[in-house]
């Protein structure tokens, strides 16, 4: 634990009453990690079908039929592509609820998209912090707050916020999708979570469009930054599971059928914990398949 003086010694540009210093904290390039995992998966005999949409899942006694549409290279037309799985694992993110519904799994949640918008500091501020800086988050919300991150390339990013999205894969401020909107307004949990967090939601929306409002969040702990220091940076989409009663799911959420297991909600630190989460899933699938074999015998 650091008091104000200890914080100032480690981070001269950060102000606060105190801080928790975690010496083991670090970052990685998740794109490179993912690419390497994909490479090793393919070496072991795996196959990754790109530009492929799952359209139907049909569970039978001894397998699951996976029906897909795949975009043809150098064209926009689609071709049918089907797979057969003895056991199916899905980590479907923004369409996790729709995938579980394909198998008629009774779930009480829906995925609501929240856009996380970032800025990058101008290069002269690459040394503004020595560590990763996180504010104290709101315990009522599963978001970490706008923080400063020193990236692998030496740059520093600011963010993210959490803005209600109107398209599940809408990375721009004005992206909308009628199907996604209809799904949301027909889901009672959407209205309840919106009512519970109305003030916060309005502030997040305002700050999304008004950069000084966004900057104010950072200035609480890094007062030397100015609006001109914030450069545009790609946004991300958080696939947030919301229950019918309007509760935001703060923890991991899984759903299953006899021959499938679905990761329905994976909050931070899901990427950091990806390998142990994978171990957990493998162990759970191993237990389920052993049960299937035992029942068959």
Locations of regions flagged by a protein language model:
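Generic secondary-structure signature for well-ordered alpha-helical cores
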Residues: 12, 42-46, 59, 105, ...
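Conserved active-site and cofactor/substrate-binding residues in soluble primary-metabolism enzymes
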Residues: 28, 32, 91-94, 143, ...
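C-terminal catalytic lobe of FAD-dependent flavoproteins
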Residues: 184-295
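General beta-strand structural signal in soluble alpha/beta enzymes
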Residues: 1-3, 48-50, 90, 158, ...
